[in-house]
C-alpha cells in the first residue's frame, strides 16, 4: 500500500513537471519571437535614421567629401583587418 501511494505521488510530480515545461516552452518561444521582431524593428529604424541623416547632410558639398573620405578610410581599415586575419590563418596552418 505504501508503494502505491509513493508511485502515485511520483506520477503527480512528473505530471506537474511536464506541465511546467509545456508552459515555459511557449513563453520562451514568444519572448524569442518578440526579441527577434524588436531587433528587426530597431535595425530598420537605425537604417531609416541613417538615410535621413544622409539626406540632411547631403546639402553641404564639404560633407560629401568628408563622407567619401570616411568611406575610403573604413574600407582601408576593413581590408587591413582582413589581411591580418588571413596572415594569422596562414601562420596557424603552417603555410608561411
From Swiss-Prot:
<dbReference type="GO" id="GO:0005576">
    <property type="term" value="C:extracellular region"/>
</dbReference>
<feature type="region of interest" description="Disordered">
    <location>
        <begin position="1"/>
        <end position="35"/>
    </location>
</feature>
<feature type="compositionally biased region" description="Basic and acidic residues">
    <location>
        <begin position="19"/>
        <end position="30"/>
    </location>
</feature>
<comment type="similarity">
    <text>Belongs to the glucagon family.</text>
</comment>
<feature type="compositionally biased region" description="Basic and acidic residues">
    <location>
        <begin position="1"/>
        <end position="12"/>
    </location>
</feature>
<dbReference type="GO" id="GO:0042594">
    <property type="term" value="P:response to starvation"/>
</dbReference>
<keyword id="KW-0165">Cleavage on pair of basic residues</keyword>
<keyword id="KW-0964">Secreted</keyword>
<dbReference type="Pfam" id="PF00123">
    <property type="entry name" value="Hormone_2"/>
</dbReference>
<keyword id="KW-0372">Hormone</keyword>
<protein>
    <recommendedName>
        <fullName>Pro-glucagon</fullName>
    </recommendedName>
</protein>
<dbReference type="GO" id="GO:0005179">
    <property type="term" value="F:hormone activity"/>
</dbReference>
<dbReference type="GO" id="GO:0031769">
    <property type="term" value="F:glucagon receptor binding"/>
</dbReference>
<dbReference type="InterPro" id="IPR015550">
    <property type="entry name" value="Glucagon"/>
</dbReference>
<dbReference type="InterPro" id="IPR000532">
    <property type="entry name" value="Glucagon_GIP_secretin_VIP"/>
</dbReference>
Amino acid at each position: 500500500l505504501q508503494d502505491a501511494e509513493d508511485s502515485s505521488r511520483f506520477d503527480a510530480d512528473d505530471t506537474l513537471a511536464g506541465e511546467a515545461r509545456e508552459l515555459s516552452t511557449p513563453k520562451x518561444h514568444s519572448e524569442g519571437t518578440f526579441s527577434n521582431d524588436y531587433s528587426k524593428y530597431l535595425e530598420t529604424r537605425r537604417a531609416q535614421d541613417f538615410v535621413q541623416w544622409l539626406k540632411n547632410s547631403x546639402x553641404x558639398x564639404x560633407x560629401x567629401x568628408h563622407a567619401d573620405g570616411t568611406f575610403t578610410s573604413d574600407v582601408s581599415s576593413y581590408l587591413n583587418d582582413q589581411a591580418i586575419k588571413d596572415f594569422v590563418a596562414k601562420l596557424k596552418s603552417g603555410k608561411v
